[in-house]
Amino acid sequence: MRKQMGAVGILLWGMAAGRAHAHGVVGQRSFIEPFITEDVNPKNEFVIARPEWDHARDGRTLSFGFGLEKKISDRFSLTLDSSWLDITPKPAAEPHASGFDNLGVTLKYAFFIDPVHEAIASIALESTAPTGTEKVGAEQNASFKPFLLYGKGLNELPDALEYLRPLGVQGDAGFEIAIDRARTTALAHNVAIEYSIPYLQQAVHDFGLAWPLSNFIGDTEFNFEHGVNGEEQGRSKVFVTPGFVYMDRWVELGVAGRFPLNQAANDELDWGVIFIVDLFIDDILPWTRWQPIGGMRPPTPPAGVTGS
């Protein structure tokens, strides 16, 4: 064995290629939990921390996001998430504010899974309850967002482009609709482009890369928001979020930058940094594999392995 995995990983990479990854699996592909884009895969996970530091011309915002997703059946999941925010405005004379954001509840169903073509599609409905602190910007009216999610690996590229096969795409698109008609309805679309070193090693060519590089996945996300009506009607914001994650069978750790790509986005953000700590709880706590529909489930097979 090349190197001990340390406290984060007890798994033995050399024992079986692909054994390290068993979450978000479609065929030989393991999709990550993106930074901004919604994960297309229903799964059991606990995002214990999603810290984000945003710097803008009108102040600085520090947020700590968290969320729990639980599978109800093999293709259906329920997510609860929120965040704590600390806002330091400019000028300093303006009041400092901190508190919790609203509670989000998301139902997700994967209606299409094609392991051979590494393709998956889901539908989801996210609703937001007005439970947060108004002084940090938490809306005091409920809202909801129906959206479509998709994921696709580039495993079908010809041999001449085999080193592009580790590329994969995840995305989501949907309308953020407020119950309060005075608020803006927005069309949001996020795209995550991933390059998987584990996939390169296992499905294309084994370069013998050592841990932890062998578990790295590059991720660049493009985040779009377009106002459909209200104060933001006709106004589009575009951001880019480049970063990378480390992912093994138990945890995903990642860091990314966040930058505006047009003037409307720059009015909201100069730059930001976002982190993620995501625990795959069904391998850490096997009893969490129990599902209301289907009962206790076996461990998710590693990428590239057919399981029940």
Residue locations for each model-derived region?
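Cleavable N-terminal signal peptides
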Residues: V8-G9, A20
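Transmembrane beta-barrel domains of Gram-negative outer membranes and organellar outer membranes
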Residues: A22-S308
